Amino acid sequence: MQGTKIRLLTGGLLMLATVGYVQAEALQPDPAWQQGTLANGFQWQVLATPQRPSDRIEVRLSVNIGSLSESTQQSGFSHFIPRLALTQNGGLPTMQARSLWQQSIDPKRPLPPAIVSYDYSLFNLSLPNNRNDLLKEALSWLASASGKMSITPEAVNHALQGEDMVATWPADTKEGWWRYRLKGSTMLGHDPAAALKQPVDIAQLKDYYHKWYTPDAMTLIVVGNVDSRSVAEQINKTFGGLKGKRETPVAVPTLSPLPTTPVSIMTDAVRQDKLSLMWDAPWQPIRDSVALQRYWRDDLAREALFWHVQQNLSKSNIKDIGLGFDCRVLYQRAQCAINIESPGERLNANLTTVARELAKVRDNGLPQDEFDALIAQKNLELQKLFATYARTDTYLLISQRMRSLQNQVVDIAPEQYQKLRQEFLNSLTVDMLNQYLRQQLSQDMALVLQQPQGEPEYNMKDLQATREKLMAPAPAAAAASNSAGDVAQGRSEATDIPPAQ
C-alpha cells in the first residue's frame, strides 16, 4: 500500500497562475463500487466486474493496526497475531481450511497471505472465479481471525513452531536506505519484523488483540464477478456479530522531510551504483477537480521531462547509464527521484550529462513540438479509456482501490474522468508545464548514492560539486523560484493512482 512506485517525478506549485481561479468541482465516487458500514463500525466495499468473468475474486481485509502502536513489552505482537491466525481453522473443518488457503493464492501473482507494516495489518486472498462457496468460507475465516481467534499457550507454541508466512512492508525493514529515510521518525523504534519476546505473555497478547482488532478499525474489499447484493448480505451476516470498539487512538506514522545533505548508503538492494536526485514534499489528498488537474499538470510535466532527457541521451549515444524517474507516496509525503544507474568510474561523468540536460530544460523550457506530441498521445489514450478500463483485471483494480484509500484519493467513474481529463488537455499550454519545471528544477535536491555492499565509499563532495556547478540557477531565476515557492508552499504532490479508475 505504502510506497508504491509511481510513474515519474513530483511537484507542482503553480496553482495561482494556472487553475487557482477555477471553481473546484467535488469528485464523485464511482457508483460502481458498493460500500457500507455495519452497526458495529465494520466497513466494506464491493466492486462487481461482469466485464472480467474469468478473473479471480480478490479479497483484502485491512486492520488499522501495526507495529507503531506496540509498547516495548508488546514488540512483535502485531506481526505475530496474523501468524497465529494463519495456523487456525477459523471455524472451518481442518481439511476445508487447508483447501481454502491452497486455493487462495494466485499462482501467477502469489501474494503473502498476510502483510504487517507500521500502521496496518492486511490479509490477502485470491479466489478462483465462480466459487461462491470459497468466498463464503473466506469471509467466515476472516471474521474468525478478526475477533474470535483462540489465544492459548498451546496455540501460541504451535504457531511459533510453524513457518512464518507473514510478510512485512517494506519487505526488508533493515535495508540501509530505508533506515536512513526513517531518521527522525518514531517508526525507527517499531520494526514490523521484530521478533516476539520470549517467553510470550499470553494475557498481554490477548489484551493487545482485543484492544486493536475491533470491527470499527477494519475494512473489507472484494473485487470480482460476484453478485454485490448477495455478498453484502453475506458480509452483514458474517461480520455483524464482531464485538469491540476502539477506545485508544492509533499511533499515526510520520516521516521527517528528506534531508538535502548528500549521502552515500551501502545496501544489498542494488547491484551497481544508483545515484538519485530527490525531491520531497507533503502529499495533498485529491478530492476535487482542481487538485486532480494540478496533479495531472505536474504528472505530464514530469513525463515530458523524462522523455526529453531520455531522447537527448540516446541521440548523444551515451552508454553505461540507466535513467529512470520514480515517485512514491510514503506516509503522506511525496518522494520523487531522477535515478542514474552507472558504473562507479562513470558516475560523475554521467551525472554531468544528466545535470546539463536538466539545466537546459530549466532555463529554456520544453519545445512546443514535444508538448504537442505529448498532448496528441494523451488524447489518443483518452479515446481508448473505456477499452483500457475493460482490460484492467481484478488484481489491479483492488490494488488501485487500496492505494486510493491510503492516499485519500477519490476514485471516480470513467465517465467523469473522461470529461475532466478532456477539459484539462484542452486548456493546458506549454508555458504552464515550463513554469512548473522551472520552479521544480531550481529547488534544492537531495543527492543520494546507493552502493553495493563491499564497494569503496564514493566521495560525495565530488558529485555535489558537479551538480552545483551545472545546476546552480542564475540569480534572477533563483529569485523567481523562491517567490513561487513562498506563494504555494506545501502544494507539491504526487500519486500512485493510475488514471483510468
Where in this protein do the model-derived segments appear?
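Non-catalytic, conformational "gating/processing" segments within enzyme and secreted inhibitor domains
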Residues: 202-237, 442-446
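Acidic/histidine-enriched segments that form metal/cofactor-coordinating
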Residues: 100-208, 352-356, 363-398
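Histidine-acidic residue clusters that define the catalytic metal-binding segment
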Residues: 25-34, 178-218, 252-254, 283-290, ...
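Buried hydrophobic packing residues in well-ordered domains
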Residues: 41, 61, 79-80, 123, ...
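Gram-negative bacterial Sec-dependent N-terminal signal peptides
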Residues: 1-23
